[in-house]
Amino acid sequence: MALKMLTMRQFASRSKIDINCSIDNLAKTHNQVRYVKMLKKDNVKVVLVSGVAGTGKTLIGCSYAISGLINKQIEKVIITRPTISMNEEYGFLPGKIDEKLHNWLIPIYDSFSSVIPSTKVKEFIQQGKIEIAPLGFIRGRTFHNSCIFVDEAQNIDCIQMKTLLTRIGYKSKMIIVGDPEQCDLKQQSNGMVDFINRLSVYPDDNYSIQHIELTEEDIMRSDVVKKVLDIYNYKSNKLE
């Protein structure tokens, strides 16, 4: 794994990242390859990825976003995740918005830093090329020529999901990732599951919006993660 990350850093140290090489190197399974394929298609505007922990949802999506920024294929990367309710405010917290949300966004920063040095990530944030956009602040905005990355989407409610999906502007792509099994919301309030269900029964052509499901077979972390999930999924009469 360390060797793979070093190779990606070497790509990033050049004037232009070979996006096909750097992203393709991360895709090891059939589902991950399809994930990358949908990211690269210009006519696919929304890529919705559901899957268990450790399947590369965040890493692959963030790698695609940051590579597009460095290669000047987009002007901005917008990152968001449901930290608190859309109706709540951040004013009671000290510091700027990016400082307030730093702890919640560490997994995304880590994924960015696997492609480029962390100093470059900070530079992009300072330049406004990586923008942190809390869900409570996106209503009324439209993101043009951007890659919008949404993490932990299983904790977005139905109203927030609709608001989020209607922010996509000209020459933009939205990547939405989450694990429905780790949802902190009531099932009927789960915006991610709700939209996946709506998409599955929508009668017209919906090629511009794609859903990718990653399973335990796609886990990129150590084998013990898969074993832990197997234990939790195992049903035994002794536990009933």
Positions of PLM-derived features:
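Conserved helicase motor core of SF1/SF2 NTP-dependent helicases
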Residues: 3-38, 42-150, 154-240
